[in-house]
Amino acid sequence: MADIDDTTSAETTFLHAIDQAIDRFVSAQLPSFEPLGDDVVGFFHAAAAFVTGGKRLRASFVRAGWLGASGESAAPVMVDTAAAIELLQGSALVHDDLMDDSDTRRGRPSVHRDFEGRHRDAGRVGDAEWFGRSTAVLMGDLLLSWSNELIVDAAARVETTAGRRAVTLYDRCKSEVAAGQFLDVVAQTRPDVSVDDAMLVARYKSAKYTVERPLQIGAALAGGDDALLDGLSAVALHLGVAFQLRDDVLGVFGDPEITGKPAGDDLREGKRTVLVGRALELVGPSERSGLLAALGTDDGVAAARDLIRASGALEAIEADIADLEAEADAAIDRLDQQAQAVLRPLALRATRRAR
């Protein structure tokens, strides 16, 4: 792949349209819930604020699928569908932060920590941590409900078969991300990790959810045929795993000022990632025991990072990413020129990023 390019003006306009679509949707929701009082209104505003910003990669893949199938510019129905996928992403992130007990997200307090702090600041009675955790569960559910509502409305505005197909893919995506997240939870209960097991988590938690389904949903909404959806899938599964491997690297070696999360957070949380699995394959018995003992501890982050670096796992993962990029590039070559034009720069954004 060529060097990464800046986001195009058309893409920037599209990303701004996503924010506007979410704002419109939330504003339309509020009048029905304002009678419930300021607490609920504040909860809704906090949910909307949580999905502001971010990489918007999933929305961009919806756009790429749409453009690859239709060649049309950012139609409102596509923008609303992409916004729905971003709301789904918001739901997953709120719950993910809660399960990982993460303190921050994008440089701000995670939802459960935010509302834990609000509980204390307001002088409420009861357990502040319980309040924060409970609110995070509910906010994730709320964002999922909003996502469902928005995509069903968008699908009703296109040809019936196309709309039904897009919603079916969306429903499958929700089940796949739940399955991938559960596999991730199970992995953290095991004393060891294999690269194959970690790759399975990467495929379901990231490749399908981040790249494959958004691409296919956008293409299906525009009336794309089976051949196009299959071609997009071939691109996505290579590209999506590369995206997750880059995430693994950033979770250990990323700059907190850029990622918005503390350095080594994946190690602190005991994540059984492909990077960790690769390191365990490469080190000797004593280093292996040391790395496994360090995972999931605050004090062991620096030692675990040093062991991973010394093992050669970082170089091995970078080589894996390069191989996956090449395979994705070859799959893009098999698409028509219209699809190639929108996918190539987006593929670079997914794998050559610092956050």
Where are these regions (language model features)?
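Conserved N-terminal diphosphate/IPP-binding helix and adjacent helical/loop segment
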Residues: 1-85, 90, 94-95, 99-129, ...
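Residue-level signal for inorganic ion chemistry
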Residues: 61, 147, 180, 276, ...
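Acidic, Mg2+-coordinating active-site segments of isoprenoid diphosphate-utilizing enzymes
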Residues: 67-69, 94-124, 148, 177-195, ...
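Alpha-helical scaffolds flanking conserved acidic
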Residues: 72-88, 133, 163-169, 228-239, ...
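A short glycine-threonine-serine/GTX helix/turn-capping micro-motif
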Residues: 132-138, 196-206
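A glycine/threonine-rich phosphate-anchoring loop and its flanking beta-alpha core
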Residues: 123, 127-156
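Short hairpin/turn module used for nucleic-acid contact or packing/dimerization
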Residues: 303-355
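Transmembrane helix-loop-helix
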Residues: 151-168, 291
